[in-house]
């Protein structure tokens, strides 16, 4: 039924079920032109960091407190994907290892919210990637970053022979 209404299947997104998708839609509606871009959308949901800056120094960087039910639904979806073998699950576990569980939930919810925003705005279907593909991409990025840093310092990297 949601697919007929929206033209996209929100339930295909990992972590979103029928009830969560209905909660999100009842709060945000189907018209995504209310927000200029995904950053303003995530800020409205209370999932984007709010930087308090004074004199060029970031004093606090926390999400604003909000009682937005759609934001809460995205947080529930983020908790639901924590143990799945998907790209969102791998992202959650990586964030949890670096920043702890609370920040990982908000970061994953922010990522899911951006996906839903683009699905509803552009009417594009959800393309799921597995955790292995996600980890492979992250490994390639890390290797590229290390090579760039090594060349900047005057070194060359060579893969170890196994």
Report residues per predicted region.
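A detector of single, family-specific signature residues
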Residues: 1-162
